[in-house]
Regions:
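Alpha-helical architecture
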Residues: 37, 49-51
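Catalytic core of pol beta-like nucleotidyltransferases
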Residues: 1-31, 43-48, 59-118
């Protein structure tokens, strides 16, 4: 039987991730293509010390990504300070991600186990 606290925590985390993705839209606008949760939260085998792994796919050049990445990291830090939930974001160009998807095991795992938030 699943404890109520586990269910309550799952929905709390879901809401925090959704809010994070909405704030990413504010930063990136239409250049944001996907927000994917992967790792233990996507698989459902997380524990109280797990971070939330998030792949952020964008239609931006590497230089454009460098210009906004500190904003994204600051946003993740602010969420951790407010909620105690540690979000670990990675920002990648969507075309590069798609290009390397069949070659890099890391990208394959994200594709296979990831949960698209937006």
């Amino acid at each position: 039987m699943i404890k109520y606290q586990c269910i309550k925590n799952k929905y709390r985390i879901h809401n925090i991730i959704y809010q994070f993705s909405q704030q990413l839209k504010d930063i990136m606008g239409s250049k944001l293509t996907k927000v994917i949760v992967y790792g233990s939260y996507a698989r459902g085998d997380y524990n109280s010390s797990s971070d939330v792994d998030v792949m952020i796919l964008v239609k931006m050049s590497d230089n454009e990504i460098k210009k906004i990445e500190n904003q994204v990291y600051d946003l993740a830090f602010d969420i951790e300070m407010d909620t105690g939930v540690d979000i670990s974001p990675i920002i990648k160009n969507e075309e590069q991600y798609e290009y390397w998807l069949d070659t890099l095991p890391f990208y394959k795992n994200i594709h296979e186990e990831g949960v698209i938030v937006n």
